Amino acid sequence: MEKIEKVLEILKEQGLDGIYITKEANVKYISGYPDELAYALICPQGNYLITDSRFTELAGQSCPDFEVVNWHNCGRSIPKAVESICVKSGIRRLGFEECFTTYDKYEEIHRLLSEHRIELTGTRNIVEELRYVKSEEEVANTRIACEIADKALEELVPYIKPGVTERELCARLEFSMKMHGAQDIGFETILISGAKTSLLHGKPGDRKVEEGDFVLVDYGAKYNGYISDTTRTFAVGHVSEQQKEIYELVREAQETGVRNMGPGIVASKPDAEIRKVVKKYEEYYYSGMGHGVGLDLHEEPFLGMYGTKIMQPGCVITMEPGIYIPGWGGVRIEDTVLITENGAETLTHFPKDLMIL
């Protein structure tokens, strides 16, 4: 209930009587609802979870502090369910997540509420600001996700060799995470090889790993909704001097980023230190250096040259500098990192020394 009380405080400060929450991760955070196709409405008069008949039993079990509203009983309409709650609760000014509400739903809700002279007001980042600093329970879930991911990658390594396809390696990795207790994969796995490793979000395909390749693995496990995020780059068979040079630069850059992270640090500061390390290849360092991770893969704080957030104990971030040379390939090394009272603790522990397989 502490989360809800904080939301109600923010609503009061903003002159709102309630808020309609549509972003899936925000609904889970505020209610505990573990699935999809549910929406929350929070107001001083009560907490409501709006879903349909397929999910009402699950909602009742997982959200004991919420009244479950089946929109099938409200004219089979989500907007009409929102209208019914607002009228019943005496809401005069309702906030909604303007970045996560479709225009057609906004129009219909606005039309229905206008008939009752209820104002509909766009809001941003009310729940996200609460998610910025993780609770002990959230950190514990993230730790387990990281442990699962580490074990799965360790099991994958013997299979990274010439002749195996990216798709096969990806399948083995994802299966291993689930066998070790992952609720699901954290996000779509990036497992690419050869020149494809310059693609920041390349997709695994039927390409077979070859001697002299880099193999880049960017993956995560999900546990109780919380996501880990790790990247490691492996060499196969042999490496050139340039491959060694770039790998070691990226490793030094990544470790420099973690060393320069801690409470009170602005999100842009480590980027300047990383750029000093990769100066020779700076034109190929064009991705962000990291981001927050939790219920979403990418969430506040966003790290990089233009980052403005101040790190606080309990923030969970990634540190993922990379060098990407089109037509040649790329290297990325990434860890999930917890901001602590005294600095930064790396939660993913797979070795970062260059492994030649």
What are these regions (language model features)?
Residues 1-357:
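Active-site neighborhoods and metal-handling regions in enzymes and metal-associated proteins
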